[in-house]
Amino acid sequence: MSTMTPAEIVSELDKHIIGQAKAKKAVAVALRNRWRRQQVADPLRQEITPKNILMIGPTGVGKTEIARRLAKLADAPFIKIEATKFTEVGYVGRDVDSIVRDLIEISVKQTRETEMRKVRSKATDQAEDRILDILLPQPRAVGFGGNAEHANDDNNATRQTFRKRLREGQLDDKEVELDIEQPSAGMDIMAPPGMEEMTEQIRSMFSNLGSGKKQRRKVKIKEALKLLTDEEAAKMLNDEEVKTKAVQNVEQNGIVFLDEIDKITSRNNEGSGGEVSRQGVQRDLLPLVEGTTVNTKYGMVKTDHILFIASGAFHLAKPSDLIPELQGRFPIRVELDSLSVNDFEAILVATDASLVKQYQALLATEDVQLEFADDGIRRLAEIAYSVNEKTENIGARRLYTVIEKLLEEVSFSAGNHAGERVTIDAKYVDRALGEVSQDEDLSRYVL
């Protein structure tokens, strides 16, 4: 679980997302409150439930990116899911309980990796011993007294020399034969609606059939060391303990990001006739968000303290079009702003992995030095903003289209210009994009 303060969380988000201070603050406080709650003593701790967040804003302004970056900072089980994937119980499709099942799978994987890291050092030593046993088989005891001791000393000295060479990577390309446990063959079973639990049990039963079998393989020592380290680390783990910790982690720290929630509002489906009732999906979400118990293959999981963050563009609908009960489950509402020309300019250059840095790195692999002048950056931002205003507003995603079109010729012929420098200034931008950006009909199709 993350112990970062709200200011530190916002500072980290600022490295990747421009603007949207209100949304960043709301998310940072919600994440910090998870830690604060853990410091409160029972029974009051059980009464403190997370305050779910509804992010409202046009497409391409950073809603999904905030969630994606939050996942890395949270150090907690996190799942991002589109609300449109689900159907009302009784219809063909996924039911909302599968959100929790997917989240617990993520938590088990995360917990297993955490526990394996704790024992990795010891597992690596044991893996090295197994490889050294293959390279230097133990000599059979021959003779008595001093001779046997002398042989043992020699063997230990040789073993230490080989261990040193192994750790320095000098033996990486040498091949060895190993008996490696085969992973159990996965079996995909189509689940009828409402029978996901039975399907999981059948899948688990079949997956255990092939487990424990060993296969003899010839691999390089570098790969062998990794395989054996994973095998030894897995032996040290207690599976029941991992499952218990994973369930506890989901219940106390889990975060669910529900994207496109505006697409399941009733207004969007007025007059839709035979379409599956989206209002039914909202009603199915209610108990999950409010707090219920979901049966999974790892045991019962309570959702009372899972944090839900929902987001939507709400172009054709309003938050008030959600059913009242669901509206009440998202007490914190944050509106994200549309992007200005200055925001576009900052997105191009100010973030840690900005588009400009990405394209410079890509073309540097062909020994082409790409430079962006300040006036070139400004002109790019103005064109992206202008096209958004004239056609559909897709936010920062417009920059991908604009810069890809701008660098199309450079990218295509980069191999012929090795060692050269290409400067992108306002004139270059106008020459490449001017006609397309000014012609509204053309920009609809090209940009």
Swiss-Prot record:
Keywords: ATP-binding, Chaperone, Cytoplasm, Nucleotide-binding, Stress response. GO terms for molecular function: ATP binding; ATP hydrolysis activity; peptidase activity; proteasome-activating activity. CDD domains: RecA-like_HslU (cd19498). The keyword Cytoplasm applies. It is found in: Cytoplasm. ATPase subunit of a proteasome-like degradation complex; this subunit has chaperone activity. The binding of ATP and its subsequent hydrolysis by HslU are essential for unfolding of protein substrates subsequently hydrolyzed by HslV. HslU recognizes the N-terminal part of its protein substrates and unfolds these before they are guided to HslV for hydrolysis. Belongs to the ClpX chaperone family. HslU subfamily. A double ring-shaped homohexamer of HslV is capped on each side by a ring-shaped HslU homohexamer. The assembly of the HslU/HslV complex is dependent on binding of ATP. NCBIfam families: hslU, PRK05201.1. This is ATP-dependent protease ATPase subunit HslU. It comes from Burkholderia lata (strain ATCC 17760 / DSM 23089 / LMG 22485 / NCIMB 9086 / R18194 / 383).
